Amino acid sequence: MDLPGPIHDFLLVFFGSGLILGGLGVILFTNPIFSAFSLGLVLVCISLFYIIANSQFVASAQLLIYVGAINVLIIFAVMFINGLEYDKNLRLFTLGDGMTLVICTGIFFLLITTILNTSGYGIIWTTKLNQILEQDLINNSQQIGIHLSTDFFPPFELISIILLVALIGAIAVARQ
């Protein structure tokens, strides 16, 4: 999406905040239903990032597959699990949680500083060659094939890893 700079930056911050808050909700909510809805918020924010990055096909695939199918499946699986009783004396924040919070926060800030200091940060990846190639292709399926095998290969690989982790988590929950 070709937006003016300030609007683009505002949307990035807004969707990034939704992504971070949704991720914290997945981790911190003790109710699995609330965690599943927070996961839905995370997946929607990721698809909105793809829309901002001019990847409408990847965004629609993200919405249809992950939010529309996988997240709904997780919510139904959690709802059909025989009533887990939560301990009333459950301490919400333990020493291990604090250590994990400190380590994860440190890793987060390390990644942010690494990304900002990388020489490839801020490069516009769309080139004139890609635009000329898109004009030469006959139909949309050829364009989608070229983009999936070149430009959007890393996002789809990351999406497949997320799907694998979600399936392993669903199997672990189902076995309990």
UniProtKB/Swiss-Prot annotation:
Catalytic function, reaction form: a plastoquinone + NADH + (n+1) H(+)(in) = a plastoquinol + NAD(+) + n H(+)(out); a plastoquinone + NADPH + (n+1) H(+)(in) = a plastoquinol + NADP(+) + n H(+)(out)
Main localisation: plastid
Membrane topology type: Multi-pass membrane protein
Keyword Kinase found: no
A GO cellular component entry from the record: chloroplast thylakoid membrane
Protein keywords: Chloroplast, Membrane, NAD, NADP, Plastid, Plastoquinone, Quinone, Thylakoid, Translocase, Transmembrane, Transmembrane helix, Transport
Domain of life the protein comes from: Eukaryota
Pfam families hit by this protein: Oxidored_q3
Coiled coil start-end: none
InterPro entries (alphabetical): NAD(P)H-Q_Oxidoreduct_6, NADH_UbQ/plastoQ_OxRdtase_su6, Nuo/plastoQ_OxRdtase_6_NuoJ
Known EC number: 7.1.1.-
One MF annotation (Gene Ontology) recorded for this entry: NADH dehydrogenase (ubiquinone) activity
Membrane-spanning parts: 10-30, 33-53, 61-81, 92-112, 152-172
Record's subunit section: NDH is composed of at least 16 different subunits, 5 of which are encoded in the nucleus.
PANTHER family recorded: NAD(P)H-QUINONE OXIDOREDUCTASE SUBUNIT 6, CHLOROPLASTIC (PTHR48479:SF1)
Role this protein plays: NDH shuttles electrons from NAD(P)H:plastoquinone, via FMN and iron-sulfur (Fe-S) centers, to quinones in the photosynthetic chain and possibly in a chloroplast respiratory chain. The immediate electron acceptor for the enzyme in this species is believed to be plastoquinone. Couples the redox reaction to proton translocation, and thus conserves the redox energy in a proton gradient.
Family named by the database record: Belongs to the complex I subunit 6 family.
Protein name: NAD(P)H-quinone oxidoreductase subunit 6, chloroplastic
Lineage, top ranks: Eukaryota, Viridiplantae, Streptophyta, Embryophyta, Tracheophyta
Gene: ndhG
